[in-house]
Amino acid sequence: LPHFITNVAIPCVKLSNLDFYFLPERLLVKRGNTFAAVFYKNLQISGFTTRFIEDERVPGDAKVVDHTWRYVNKHGGPDRRFNNNRQLPICAYSEYTLTSDTGIYEVLMTSKQGAMDAFAGFLCQIGNLQSQMKLADIR
């Protein structure tokens, strides 16, 4: 962020079309030239493990939990009509949903299970502290 001067490093997650900046008291979301900000007390983060069919190279930190076929017949086996029907790994990925009552709705997926669990918990703790503070204290 070129216009911000801080005395701490600002953690940032850059995605294809948006950036998350985790400021000390709020999340700043940048999409193009548009910014949105939300206090952590107004941010909900939920996470769970999901099964993801990986059609490309499996990341080194991913856990393969099963396999399937690119083309499946009605019994769940390989569809023999396709000669390029290769087996695909099913990986256990973590999916995190960030929402707020101000309109933020973003979904992040990590190939490493639980990769953001501790960080999400930390942000929730900050939000809990903000909820206990008076409004004037966090402005």
Regions found by a protein language model. Name each.
Residues 1-139:
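A composition-biased, non-transmembrane "mature-region" signal
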